[in-house]
Design a protein with these regions (language model features):
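Conserved SAM-binding strand-loop segment of SAM-dependent methyltransferases
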Residues: 77-85
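Short, acidic/turn-prone active-site loops that include or flank metal/cofactor-
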Residues: 37-40, 84-86, 124-126
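Conserved acidic residues
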Residues: 59, 77, 91-93
């Protein structure tokens, strides 16, 4: 990655945590909002943009829930049709995993094998043995 390029993060899982991360990354503010219902969420005013927007950007999201995908599109977020498509995107530097906990291990392994950096919601894995296996 060139130092003049933005670090591109893609999010798998766009529920409560993933959508909050999407808002923070898309807005450039680094600020998140709590959303009880993802369809009610709105991106913050771009006038709030901080230096964060000069360093990183949201590459896109994917989710198995069509309503969450529709929300992302309505917010101007690129949507990947599958996790595999996201992993194949050479412009993506990192994957932020915000899926149910039992999926973290397999998704992290797949992302690492695809050459991506991994950010994972807590708990990072279901056990320390799983984490050691991933590392």
């Amino acid at each position: 990655m060139n130092m003049n390029e933005k670090f591109r993060i893609a999010i798998v899982g766009c529920g409560g945590m993933g959508s909050g991360h999407a808002v923070a990354l898309k807005s450039g503010t680094g600020e998140t909002v709590y959303m009880g219902n993802v369809s009610d969420a709105k991106m913050p005013d771009s006038a709030m943009t901080t230096h964060l927007g000069n360093l990183i950007e949201l590459a896109g999201i994917t989710d198995i829930d069509p309503l969450r995908m529709e929300w992302a599109v309505s917010q101007g977020v690129f949507v990947y049709s599958s996790y595999e498509e996201m992993l194949a995107d050479k412009s993506v530097d990192a994957i932020l995993i915000a899926t149910p906990n039992h999926l973290h291990k397999s998704m992290a392994i797949a992302a690492l094998r695809a050459g991506k950096h991994v950010l994972c919601e807590k708990p990072v894995m279901l056990s320390s043995a799983d984490l050691l296996e991933v590392m």
